[in-house]
Amino acid sequence: MGQKWKLYIVKDGKVIRKNKFCPRCGPGVFMADHGDRWACGRCGYTEWKKK
């Protein structure tokens, strides 16, 4: 916890998110990238990536 700064990058003077937000929990709750899926650690929502 407390390391949300690692989930942002600055490119061409703009701040860009590396991971996406959870559609259930809303802005501020990031989903974890597990390679084959995106998962929310708060509510458990999972999106599978397409091959």
Curated annotation (Swiss-Prot):
A zinc finger (C4-type) spans 22-43. GO terms for molecular function: structural constituent of ribosome; zinc ion binding. Keywords: Metal-binding, Ribonucleoprotein, Ribosomal protein, Zinc, Zinc-finger. It comes from the Archaea. Pfam families: Ribosomal_S27. GO terms for biological process: translation. This is Small ribosomal subunit protein eS31. It comes from Pyrococcus abyssi (strain GE5 / Orsay). The gene is rps27ae.
